Amino acid sequence: RVNYGLLPYFDEFWVSDNTDALQRVYMQWGTSYFFPAIAMASHISASPNHQTFRRIPLKYRIDVAMSGRLGMEIQLQDMTTEEKELCKKAIAEYKEIRSVVQFGDIYRLISPYEKQGVASLMYTSPEKDKAVVYWWKLEHFHNQHLHVCSYMV
C-alpha cells in the first residue's frame, strides 16, 4: 500500500484499510515520520466502525481525519441533518487550514505511545506565521487528571 517510490506517480495512499479513528491516531503518527500529511488519505468513516465495531463520536473522527488528507468514507443517507451540518462546517474549516496541514512542518508534541492517554501534534506554515494544533484523548477517563498542554501563540 505505502510505497515511497510511487509518490511521484500517485497523489495519496491508504495508510491502512482500518479507518477506526482511535487506531488511526497511532497509525498516522508513525506514518508521519516518513510520509507527508498530503499523501496520507485520512477519511471520516461510519460509526460503528466496520472493522472494529467501535462507536466514536463524529467530531473525534473528523479531527483525526483533518490531520491528514481529509476525505469522506461515510454514507450521506445514513447521517442526521446535524451530522451533515457538522461535516459541512468541518470541510469548510479544513479548506482554511489545508495548506498548513498538507505543506507545513510537523511537530510531535505528545506521542500516543507515551501512554499518557492523549496525543498531540502541531503543523506550522513554512513561514511559521500559522499553526494548527491537534489534541486527542485516547482513553476513557474516570476522575483522572489529563496531561496539561501549554501552547504559546
Residue ranges and their predicted role:
Residues 1-78:
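Glycan-recognition surfaces
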Residues 9-27, 99-106, 123-138:
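Short, Lys/Arg-enriched charge-dense amphipathic segments
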Residues 59-111:
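Catalytic cores of secreted or luminal carbohydrate-active enzymes
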Residues 113-152:
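Carbohydrate-binding surface patches
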